[in-house]
């Protein structure tokens, strides 16, 4: 966590900037390769997993836990319709089935969730009872399907301390981008790569059953936490056309109760 100035001198007043890398839809055949790099660089990332993909890859999930990564829930089977169009019991069951499978695989349920397409209502979040995470940077890896293009898309975005990056560990080019280019470069630039919960804790944010998309200082200073889902037209491009371009408003959990566009994943 030490911070050094450009001249190499130690600055005790500063902390290393942090970014949370998140990976959806796994585990898959490339996840172990990603974990090799996680171990090599001694970093932590968050995996938002589909319950149906956990069975048969229990050892991979166990390794995630052993390496200090965060276990996230992305529903059982990524239903084709957005969660707001489903009844409440069905939505809760999507997450509960996945938690049950995760407990069988690694002895623990997910600590955080991400809704398919990023779409979920305040009532549904409350019923699931866990923090939900959006993202501030979409790699568009589902669309680009090229490691170099994925890397350029991410690095040309507004990355900064508190950013949350969306990727998918089910795509080989995405994992190649992360392992060969993105992770080495972010570490080289001085970023500490952490889980979403570690990022929240570092920013003194107590997570609630609400939706979060970043922990930028500007967001925190604007009073947008807890529950700020900041993917709007003037922030990150949050579309994931591999799944849907639909967007559904979710409550931001702030005192004014205003809604913000959730984007999609």
Q: What spans do the regions from the language model cover?
A:
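C-terminal domain-boundary segment and adjacent tail
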Residues: 2-6, 10-11, 41, 54-55, ...
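A cross-domain feature marking catalytic cores of carbohydrate-active enzymes
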Residues: 23, 49-52, 73-75, 114-117, ...
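Ser/Thr/Gly/Pro-rich low-complexity, disordered linker/stalk segments of secreted
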Residues: 217-265
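Active-site beta->alpha N-cap acidic-glycine motif
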Residues: 1-97, 101-104, 109, 183-185, ...
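Hydrophobic alpha-helix-in-membranes signature
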Residues: 114-115, 130, 183
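Alpha-helical scaffold elements lining the catalytic groove of polysaccharide deacetylases
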Residues: 79-108, 119-161, 174-178
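Residue-level preference for the first positions of well-ordered beta-strands
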Residues: 19, 161-164
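Short low-complexity, flexible loop/linker segments enriched in glycine and/or proline
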Residues: 61-63, 87-89, 148-150, 207-213
């Amino acid at each position: 966590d030490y911070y050094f100035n450009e001249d190499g001198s130690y600055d005790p007043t500063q902390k290393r900037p942090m970014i949370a890398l998140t990976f959806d839809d796994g585990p898959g055949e490339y996840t172990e390769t990603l974990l090799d790099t996680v171990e090599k660089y001694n970093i932590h990332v968050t995996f938002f997993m589909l319950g149906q993909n956990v069975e048969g890859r229990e050892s991979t999930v166990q390794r995630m836990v052993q390496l200090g990564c965060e276990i996230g829930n992305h529903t059982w089977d990524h239903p084709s319709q957005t969660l707001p169009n489903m009844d409440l019991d069905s939505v809760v069951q999507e997450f509960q089935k996945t938690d049950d499978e995760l407990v069988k695989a690694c002895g623990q349920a997910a600590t955080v969730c991400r809704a398919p397409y990023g779409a979920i209502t305040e009532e549904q979040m409350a019923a699931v009872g866990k923090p939900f995470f959006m993202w501030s940077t979409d790699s568009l890896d589902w669309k680009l399907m090229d490691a170099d293009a994925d890397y350029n898309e991410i690095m040309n975005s507004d990355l900064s301390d508190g950013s949350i990056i969306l990727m998918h560990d089910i795509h080989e080019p995405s994992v190649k981008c992360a392992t060969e280019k993105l992770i080495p470069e972010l570490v080289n630039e001085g970023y500490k790569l952490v889980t979403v919960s570690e990022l929240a804790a570092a920013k003194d944010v107590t997570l609630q059953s609400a939706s979060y998309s970043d922990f930028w200082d500007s967001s925190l200073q604007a009073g947008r936490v807890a529950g700020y889902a900041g993917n709007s037209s003037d922030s990150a491009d949050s579309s994931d056309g591999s799944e849907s371009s639909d967007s559904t408003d979710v409550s931001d959990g702030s005192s004014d109760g205003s809604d913000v566009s959730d984007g999609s994943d």
